């Protein structure tokens, strides 16, 4: 007895004629508007911000605290380097945030707005497993203690006999 690995199909499919011309038209037109080419329509742009206090209020994150360090002068702020900001006593995360906004403001890349700080979930990516494990262990322990207290209460009332 022999088995055929490749059986012929029961119904032969008709062969279609090859197309004589190939029409290659895109389904939808390609957009040429990149993010960098779009115009900035916001009111908080380079043309509308003339003082440092307004700038700091728009970018948020309590940068207004450092207004005195720059003597409320926008041009002085825009020319300040990271090293100078460090010498002024501005912490690293705020300093980097300000420097990013200086770059975006000078090149008119983005309207001024506050970027919220990220919030860690479950202690951050590295510690997530241990934090979740501790949390579930504490839940189990609380459940166990609650069950034991209920059992003791039931035994005291005489509902359980051991």
Curated annotation (Swiss-Prot):
Residues 1-37 form a transit peptide. Transmembrane segments: none annotated. It is found in: Mitochondrion. It holds the Pfam family SAM_Ribosomal_mS41. It comes from the Eukaryota. One of its GO terms (cellular component) is ribonucleoprotein complex. InterPro entries: Ribosomal_mS41 (IPR039603), SAM/pointed_sf (IPR013761), SAM_Ribosomal_mS41 (IPR019083). Its main location: mitochondrion. Keywords: Mitochondrion, Ribonucleoprotein, Ribosomal protein, Transit peptide. Residues 112-135 are annotated as: Disordered. Disulfide bonds: none annotated. Involved in telomere length regulation. Belongs to the mitochondrion-specific ribosomal protein mS41 family. This is Small ribosomal subunit protein mS41. It comes from Debaryomyces hansenii (strain ATCC 36239 / CBS 767 / BCRC 21394 / JCM 1990 / NBRC 0083 / IGC 2968). The gene is FYV4.
């Amino acid at each position: 007895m022999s088995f055929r690995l490749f059986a012929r199909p029961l119904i032969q499919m008709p062969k279609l004629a090859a197309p004589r011309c190939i029409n290659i038209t895109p389904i939808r037109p390609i957009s040429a508007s990149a993010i960098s080419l779009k115009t900035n329509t916001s009111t908080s742009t380079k043309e509308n911000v003339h003082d440092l206090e307004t700038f700091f209020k728009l970018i948020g994150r309590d940068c207004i605290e450092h207004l005195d360090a720059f003597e409320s002068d926008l041009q002085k702020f825009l020319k300040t380097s990271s090293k100078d900001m460090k010498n002024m006593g501005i912490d690293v995360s705020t300093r980097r945030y300000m420097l990013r906004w200086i770059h975006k403001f000078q090149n008119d890349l983005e309207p001024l707005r506050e970027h919220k700080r990220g919030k860690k979930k479950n202690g951050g990516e590295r510690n997530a497993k241990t934090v979740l494990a501790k949390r579930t262990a504490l839940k189990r322990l609380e459940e166990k203690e609650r069950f034991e207290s209920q059992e003791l209460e039931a035994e005291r009332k005489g509902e359980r006999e051991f």
